Amino acid sequence: MSQEFAHLSVLLEETVGGLNIKDDGIYIDGTFGRGGHSRQVLQRLGENGRLIAIDRDPQAIEAAKQFADDPRFQIVHGGFGQLADYVEELGLVGKIDGVLLDLGVSSPQLDDAERGFSFLRDGPLDMRMDNSQGETAAQWLARAEIEDMAWVFKTYGEEKNARHIARCIAADRDKTPFLRTKDLADLIARITKNKERNKHPATRVFQAIRIYINSELDQIDQALEGALTILAPQGRLSIISFHSLEDRIVKRFIRRHSQGESVPHGLPITEDQINKSRKLRAIGKAIMPSDEEIERNARARSSVLRIAERLDY
């Protein structure tokens, strides 16, 4: 694999192991990236197994050519939020043995200045996962109302100074538009008074804009609900999150479908009927990276893996 596609997959063994792979199983890697997790899945599959990978990044689709000669593998160019639609088109609803999701932005995307994801590298203020379509971060910042920007920064970045930053962006863009990552990062650094130790002042705003531009949290919601409809009995969900907003969605989803439907106290309903509404069971507790993995790959530090299994009722 070329250096351009180099990428260290986080919690690799734990995530793929959590799928409990069967020789002839059918699996989905909803976030192909540079293929680290897919490679491990293929190594564990038998010759009759199948892996469907999904990614909306054109560079990831290019990277998938490394598996072009493997008849068990296919790649779909699209968002993982639509995974149930792709599976339905393939006639595989109820036959999927596992879904893997590695959420957030990948290292190659962060490291490529031209993608505009990082405040540490100057490049076009883009931030689109699929840079062949949609509105860029620069275009959104040029038109967004102060209230809208403040809401995005607060909701998706948990930024305490959301309104102040939004006002400053609106005031400055009338003189000079924000076209580069450095333009935005420098402004935020300049106007932020109480800086967090070991954290760039622009971290939360960049995260918020990226999540908004790519509808990332909506994609997660859609993917999780879709996974329930396509998983076979005992099929597994193996999901890596990188910040609290992502993990909160995954955690609540698993909890909600593990507990079954809530019914008012006193209704004449049996425990068996309640159990039938349970669709998942959590497999163990949340898994964090080891100190050794964090030392090898600092970006693993905030990762959280959650695994769940589709119940057979």
From Swiss-Prot:
Q: Where in the cell is it found?
A: Cytoplasm
The UniProt catalytic activity note for this protein reads: cytidine(1402) in 16S rRNA + S-adenosyl-L-methionine = N(4)-methylcytidine(1402) in 16S rRNA + S-adenosyl-L-homocysteine + H(+)
Q: Which InterPro entries match?
A: RsmH, SAM-dep_MeTrfase_MraW_recog, SAM-dependent_MTases_sf
Record flagged with keyword Protein transport: no
| Molecular-function GO terms, alphabetical | rRNA (cytosine-N4-)-methyltransferase activity
Its BP terms in the Gene Ontology are: rRNA base methylation
What stretches pass through the bilayer? none
Residues annotated for S-adenosyl-L-methionine binding in this entry: 35-37, 55, 80, 102, 109
What EC number(s) does its UniProt record assign?
A: 2.1.1.199
Keywords of the record: Cytoplasm, Methyltransferase, rRNA processing, S-adenosyl-L-methionine, Transferase
Q: Per its UniProt record, what SUPFAM superfamilies does this chain match? A: Putative methyltransferase TM0872, insert domain, S-adenosyl-L-methionine-dependent methyltransferases
* Protein family (similarity comment): Belongs to the methyltransferase superfamily. RsmH family.
> HAMAP family this protein is in?
16SrRNA_methyltr_H
What this protein is reported to do is described as:
Specifically methylates the N4 position of cytidine in position 1402 (C1402) of 16S rRNA.
In its UniProt entry, what is this protein called? Ribosomal RNA small subunit methyltransferase H
* Species name: Shewanella sp. (strain ANA-3)
